[in-house]
Amino acid sequence: MRSYLDFEKPVAELEAKLEELRALGARDGAVAIAEDVARLESKAAAALAELYAALTPWQKTQVARHPQRPHFVDYCDALISEFTPLAGDRSFGEDEAIVGGFGRFRGRPVCVIGQEKGASTEARIRHNFGMARPEGYRKAVRLMDLAGRFGLPVLTFVDTAGAYPGIDAEERGQAEAIARSTEACLALGTPNLALVIGEGGSGGAIALATANRVLMLEHAIYSVISPEGAASILWRDAGRAQDAATAMKITAQDLLRLGVIDAIVPEPTGGAHRDPAAAFRAAEEAIAEGLAGLDGLDAEALRDQRAQKFLEIGRKL
């Protein structure tokens, strides 16, 4: 069953009427409603396209958090063959908020790492809603070290509200783990490419997104803090999250203009959750193009390009 966001109410009403018409036609085939169905389909599609062509930053935030939006494991299943996951950081334990391993992208061996939020209640609890603890980031470092040793490109998929802020995570060195993961990204002698597929929240995101190429899905967001968190700090009112979302420039379109990301990956009309297969195809093409542009660079050039990219962001912003 499709889940609608609050601003999608006009589209929801049209599609509900459309389903009623289809059900009527299924019950009584003699009823000539084909033209009515076609007309309503066209009207609903036009309304959806018009709505999504002018989303506000806050509406994009809602789309990025949509409960039916494809998660990392969905992209991994669609894009990576022969995927073999690795577990544990070889220091403390396993953290399922970050899933990673090795597989093939279009037949090419790669290392794949992603933040997984989980689709069901049970999965969300198991994956801690995509909020990684230190062992998750240390597992990512372990995987990147292996990728560097074997000369494999690293693909990272970012989808997190932020690193887990619990006391246990702080006691085990959360800040240090995030810093080490960021350092490992910068030190890689092989190409790395990051794709923000949903939320890119704070240090929890940058720990996997310090890459040669940083891509974002059209309706993803990427920021130093959530809109609610920013509103609470700036105005002492989380209810002003919409104002914060606009002020922080968190959308893919704003971040491309500012030079923080390298490219925007288009989503199907209505968001990736409406047509996951189309979203996977667009992501595949963007990743393939990004890797092709890095293939001619040696280890030193890759590190230098990566470092200069982020130094330039610091100078400009």
Swiss-Prot record:
<dbReference type="InterPro" id="IPR029045">
    <property type="entry name" value="ClpP/crotonase-like_dom_sf"/>
</dbReference>
<keyword id="KW-0067">ATP-binding</keyword>
<comment type="subunit">
    <text>Acetyl-CoA carboxylase is a heterohexamer composed of biotin carboxyl carrier protein (AccB), biotin carboxylase (AccC) and two subunits each of ACCase subunit alpha (AccA) and ACCase subunit beta (AccD).</text>
</comment>
<dbReference type="GO" id="GO:0009317">
    <property type="term" value="C:acetyl-CoA carboxylase complex"/>
</dbReference>
<keyword id="KW-0443">Lipid metabolism</keyword>
<feature type="domain" description="CoA carboxyltransferase C-terminal">
    <location>
        <begin position="39"/>
        <end position="293"/>
    </location>
</feature>
<dbReference type="GO" id="GO:0016743">
    <property type="term" value="F:carboxyl- or carbamoyltransferase activity"/>
</dbReference>
<dbReference type="InterPro" id="IPR001095">
    <property type="entry name" value="Acetyl_CoA_COase_a_su"/>
</dbReference>
<keyword id="KW-0276">Fatty acid metabolism</keyword>
<keyword id="KW-0547">Nucleotide-binding</keyword>
<dbReference type="GO" id="GO:0005524">
    <property type="term" value="F:ATP binding"/>
</dbReference>
<dbReference type="Pfam" id="PF03255">
    <property type="entry name" value="ACCA"/>
</dbReference>
<comment type="function">
    <text>Component of the acetyl coenzyme A carboxylase (ACC) complex. First, biotin carboxylase catalyzes the carboxylation of biotin on its carrier protein (BCCP) and then the CO(2) group is transferred by the carboxyltransferase to acetyl-CoA to form malonyl-CoA.</text>
</comment>
<keyword id="KW-0963">Cytoplasm</keyword>
<keyword id="KW-0808">Transferase</keyword>
<dbReference type="GO" id="GO:0006633">
    <property type="term" value="P:fatty acid biosynthetic process"/>
</dbReference>
<dbReference type="GO" id="GO:2001295">
    <property type="term" value="P:malonyl-CoA biosynthetic process"/>
</dbReference>
<dbReference type="GO" id="GO:0003989">
    <property type="term" value="F:acetyl-CoA carboxylase activity"/>
</dbReference>
<comment type="similarity">
    <text>Belongs to the AccA family.</text>
</comment>
<keyword id="KW-0444">Lipid biosynthesis</keyword>
<dbReference type="InterPro" id="IPR011763">
    <property type="entry name" value="COA_CT_C"/>
</dbReference>
<protein>
    <recommendedName>
        <fullName>Acetyl-coenzyme A carboxylase carboxyl transferase subunit alpha</fullName>
        <ecNumber>2.1.3.15</ecNumber>
    </recommendedName>
</protein>
<keyword id="KW-0275">Fatty acid biosynthesis</keyword>
<comment type="pathway">
    <text>Lipid metabolism; malonyl-CoA biosynthesis; malonyl-CoA from acetyl-CoA: step 1/1.</text>
</comment>
